[in-house]
């Protein structure tokens, strides 16, 4: 019986993980990222104030100023700019450098490496800060309010 359960479990693993191996585009990757990125998943000090029903740059009124294969620049009306640079495409997702100004003037310029993951054509890219280092994208700027807490 234990052998049978083990065989069933091994048979189900590929089906369970199949949804995570969605192919990412090979061309116009930066444009794809700008269109599909859920901006509510980028670091707090860089993202726009959460607004119900809004998730993408275009939902928040950002307009793409420039886009090529590996880099895009989006800008909102009050002069807020965010640069998105594709660093690496890997099996686990797309590594990007997000570069822009913080919410407050005192935040200054902020730059972070994010790992973006996509669940499929109907979903959005979800970002999380990556610990992977890239020489072309050093961590710059303020701390998230969430991570700046006590060390106790």
Predicted features along the sequence, with ranges:
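N-terminal signal peptide c-region/cleavage motif recognized by signal peptidases
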Residues: 12-16
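Sec-dependent signal peptide recognition
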Residues: 1-9
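Exposed acidic/polar residues on beta-strands and adjacent loops within beta-sheet cores, strongest
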Residues: 18-152
């Amino acid at each position: 019986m234990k052998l049978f359960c083990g065989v069933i479990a091994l048979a189900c693993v590929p089906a369970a993980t199949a949804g995570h191996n969605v192919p990412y585009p090979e061309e116009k990757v930066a444009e794809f990222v700008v269109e599909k990125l859920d901006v509510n998943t980028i670091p707090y000090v860089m993202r726009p104030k959460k607004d119900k029903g809004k998730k993408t740059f275009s939902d928040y009124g950002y307009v793409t100023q420039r886009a090529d294969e590996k880099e895009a620049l989006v800008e909102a009306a009050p002069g807020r700019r965010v640069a998105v640079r594709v660093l690496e495409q890997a099996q686990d997702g797309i590594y990007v450098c997000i570069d822009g100004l913080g919410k407050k003037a005192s935040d200054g310029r902020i730059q972070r490496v994010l790992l973006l993951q996509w669940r499929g054509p109907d979903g959005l890219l979800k970002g999380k800060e990556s610990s992977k280092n890239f020489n072309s994208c050093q961590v710059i700027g303020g701390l998230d309010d969430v991570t700046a807490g006590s060390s106790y």
